[in-house]
């Protein structure tokens, strides 16, 4: 299975949920937002399985002043 994560091709041997992908890719579990195919997913939907060819964007919140 192939997906795109933050503009990089990622090949997976198995189908993952959004939550599993976040852990596997080493993203922090807090302070991030995840969009799949241009739609931001609330955390309640992170158990959604990713489909082949999905585009995933992970954005980390940054504080500024």
Named regions from a protein language model:
Residues 1-64:
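Ubiquitin-like/PB1-type beta-grasp interaction modules and other compact soluble beta-rich domains
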